[in-house]
Regions:
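A structural signal for conserved, well-ordered secondary-structure elements
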Residues: 1-324
Length: 324
């Protein structure tokens, strides 16, 4: 049986290579734009106008003139040519009241009649955007605490139960950094924006990652009394091989579905599916090759800093119950 846990330092190096480019991209993006990635109006507020005109020949200058009285400094104007050859304009600006938007539409109609059936407007106030961003932060934070508490309680009969919870959180942090780094890199090079769907993808990735970690930890817990006398590292390696087929089978089902959506789905959800796809790959990797090797390294005293933290915290009282 190949000893995966023995190669844990290589797995940690691979994790570093996956995380560091994204962290660098987030630092660069923060230094240049003030945010680690391009934020949609869901988080910063504003308005997006999808404009369609009945007649061609509209220029960017015409559109800027129509907005000049109400929203000129923050305006971003982009011309889009659809597959059928029709022309649309995507305009992004600050949040405006309905009366101001109506006045802008009047200005645009004077230049060229708007196709009202194909013209769309999406607006989010800055207050709502900041509330969504705050809620997103607390949602991820709450998920981390709840998962840690659950694992500590569920594995209370295992020595050093806190280490299981902390290792699962480390895998979650790994996956969040991979997904956030991907969003930052794609935002810098391809203009991807982080919206409310991104938060959905992150929470979904965390759920899959935690599920895999718990399955592995549960098998370790079952094998510890069954293989008394074996080194802890050997028991953990055996547990990985006994559960790896289940982890891969579960994730492959999701991968095939997402791959089909990426190939044949609509453009509006492809970014969400791509983030989810990469996140689930990272979640599968981190559960097997980050959380469990980290647990072994901690148990073997290879993480003195983490050992000192664990010694400062009270250990849960063991019980006779081995169930979750």
């Amino acid at each position: 049986m190949f000893n995966l846990v023995e190669k844990r330092r290589w797995f940690f190096i691979i994790s570093a290579f996956l995380i560091i480019p994204g962290v660098v991209a987030m630092i660069y993006s923060t230094a240049t734009t003030g945010a680690p990635f391009r934020l949609s109006i869901d988080f910063v507020g504003g308005s997006i106008y999808d404009l369609a005109f009945a007649q061609p020949g509209i220029t960017e200058g015409d559109i800027r003139d129509a907005f000049a009285e109400y929203d000129d400094r923050s305006l971003t104007v982009q011309r889009l040519t659809l597959d059928d050859g029709s022309e649309r304009w995507s305009v992004r600006g600050s949040f405006l009241e309905q009366e101001q938007r109506d006045a802008i539409f009047d200005n645009l109609n004077e230049i060229s009649p708007l196709d009202r059936e194909r013209t769309q407007v999406e607006s989010v106030s800055e207050t709502i955007g900041s509330e969504v961003a705050r809620a997103a932060f607390f949602a991820v934070l709450a998920a981390s605490f709840i998962v840690s508490f659950f694992i500590i309680i569920a594995f209370r009969t295992v020595p050093n139960a806190l280490r299981y919870g902390m290792s699962a959180i480390a895998a979650m942090v790994h996956d969040v950094l991979v997904v956030m780094g991907l969003a930052s890199i794609m935002g810098l090079f391809f203009g991807w924006e982080v919206d409310a769907l991104f938060l959905t993808a992150v929470l979904t990735v965390l759920a899959y990652s935690v599920q895999d970690s718990i399955v592995l930890f549960d098998r370790i817990r079952e094998n510890i009394p069954q293989y008394l006398g074996e080194p802890y590292e050997t028991i953990v390696n055996r547990s990985i091989w006994e559960t790896i087929h289940r982890s891969l089978a579960t994730q492959l089902n999701a991968f095939f579905i997402m791959a089909a959506i990426l190939l044949f789905g609509g453009e509006t959800i492809k970014q969400f599916i791509a983030i989810l796809f990469i996140g689930l790959v990272s979640g599968t990797y981190s559960s097997i090759f980050t959380a469990v090797p980290l647990l072994v390294a901690w148990e073997k005293g290879e993480l003195p800093f983490m050992s000192r933290i664990g010694a400062m915290l009270p250990a849960p009282r063991p019980t006779e119950d081995n169930g979750i």
